[in-house]
């Protein structure tokens, strides 16, 4: 349960608000641009949520608002509301506040769980109790991050890889993900095309057909399955 500080919301300068917990949130440029328009038109409607960690205010909820405000010359301060919590509680609060607002994303949940287990040393059972979820749910979210290779994880963090695409990438062995990512960037593949490429890759485990898929992804998608997997060379 959130423990709100016994004080009224207050204004803070933007540079007083830290973003160390932003690593557990997806950066979605389109959403931030939409928030900029909203702030310009209506101003700040509700306070963002912060906690104090090591003597500094750290943002827990309101990352789009802070990111948008930093890009607007007209905004130099934001109203904040503080909760009293430690680092583990802050991570749980990020999950809880977003779930209450109907804004949870599977990948963001996975990042928080990964941090609680791998950084804070909690067991999966302890994380389940902290977040009010079943252990199997925690296990699935943890696997989602741990099956994602470092390059894909980094691109997801900065918004270059969508959560939908990430769910396809984790179907592949970590060692194969970088090659598929290169194809996605080079060919500007859609999510539907990426899904098809991952399906093909798993159906055709041989080196030659997989090289063909990497070199000619759209052509491979248009070929009959038997041709793609057995021949793996261009006609």
What is each residue range found by the language model?
Residues 1-83, 94, 100:
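Short, charged/polar connector segments at secondary-structure boundaries
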Residues 24-26, 67-147:
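Amphipathic, charge-rich alpha-helical segments that serve as recognition/docking helices
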Residues 31, 35, 65, 91, ...:
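Helical mechanochemical/support elements of P-loop NTPase systems and associated helical scaffolds
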Residues 47, 77-81, 125, 136, ...:
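A local structural micro-motif
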Residues 53, 133-134, 161:
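An acidic- and aromatic-residue-enriched active-site/binding cleft used to recognize and process polar
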Residues 108-119, 139-235:
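Amphipathic alpha-helical extensions and coiled-coil-like segments
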């Amino acid at each position: 349960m959130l423990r709100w500080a016994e004080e009224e919301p207050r204004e803070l300068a933007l540079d007083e608000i830290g973003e160390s917990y932003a690593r557990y949130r997806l950066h979605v440029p389109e959403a931030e641009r939409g928030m900029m328009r909203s702030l310009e038109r209506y101003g700040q409607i509700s306070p963002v949520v912060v906690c104090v960690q090591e003597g500094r205010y750290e943002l827990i909820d309101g990352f789009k608002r802070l990111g948008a405000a930093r890009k607007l010359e007209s905004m130099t301060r934001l109203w904040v509301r503080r909760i009293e919590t430690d680092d583990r509680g802050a991570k749980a609060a990020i999950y809880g506040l977003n779930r209450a607002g109907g804004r949870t994303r599977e990948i963001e949940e996975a990042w928080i769980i990964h941090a609680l287990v791998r950084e804070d040393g909690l067991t999966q059972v302890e994380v389940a109790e902290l977040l009010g979820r079943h252990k199997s749910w925690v296990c699935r979210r943890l696997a989602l991050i741990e099956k994602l290779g470092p390059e894909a994880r980094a691109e997801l963090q900065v918004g270059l890889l969508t959560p939908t695409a990430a769910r396809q990438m984790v179907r592949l062995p970590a060692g194969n993900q970088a090659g598929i990512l290169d194809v996605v960037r080079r060919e500007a593949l859609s999510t539907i095309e990426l899904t098809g490429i991952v399906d093909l890759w798993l159906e055709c485990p041989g080196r030659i057909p997989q090289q063909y898929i990497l070199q000619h992804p759209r052509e491979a998608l248009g070929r009959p399955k038997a041709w793609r997997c057995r021949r793996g060379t261009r006609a």
